[in-house]
Amino acid sequence: MNVILLDKIANLGNLGDQVSVKAGYARNFLLPQGKAVVANESNVKVFEARRAELEAKLAAELAAANLRAEKITALEAVVIASKAGDEGKLFGSVGNRDIADAVTAAGVELAKSEVRLPLGALRTTGDFEVEVQLHTEVKAVVKVSVVAEA
């Protein structure tokens, strides 16, 4: 199925690219989320008419993500207190939601879907550098310090 991308999508293409994708990917992900439209003559004409508007919107989103990345990088270590045993092993874990809530409480909006924990949740006390992906092109690192509750 041929589609026109309305957003930059990792490993697929940029705004305005006509790409061929599997029908299920288009029908279940790209089209419902508004990231693409079916590539037919009428949609191509509509897209070309709206191209400048869509590019301006993408540029504004990128600028906002860069601003948030600067704020996140400027943050001191975000402290999360959790119950832990004698050897620093947590009773439970610190996950995406906990990190996002702590960063939001520190003054920078962060959604749990933007937090990247490739090795899974944090299960020990200590200092960690957690990557956050604010935009397809913008990544930042937030310092998280997990301490034992008194």
Curated annotation (Swiss-Prot):
InterPro entries according to UniProt: Ribosomal_bL9 (IPR000244), Ribosomal_bL9/RNase_H1_N (IPR009027), Ribosomal_bL9_bac/chp (IPR020594), Ribosomal_bL9_C (IPR020069), Ribosomal_bL9_C_sf (IPR036791), Ribosomal_bL9_N (IPR020070), Ribosomal_bL9_N_sf (IPR036935)
GO CC terms, sorted: ribonucleoprotein complex; ribosome
Keywords per UniProt: Ribonucleoprotein, Ribosomal protein, RNA-binding, rRNA-binding
Pfam families membership: Ribosomal_L9_C, Ribosomal_L9_N
Biological processes annotated in GO: translation
Superkingdom of the source species: Bacteria
GO molecular function, one term: rRNA binding
Role according to the record: Binds to the 23S rRNA.
NCBIfam families in the record: L9
HAMAP family attached to this UniProt entry: Ribosomal_bL9
Family (UniProt): Belongs to the bacterial ribosomal protein bL9 family.
Name of the protein: Large ribosomal subunit protein bL9
Organism: Shewanella baltica (strain OS185)
Designated gene of the protein: rplI
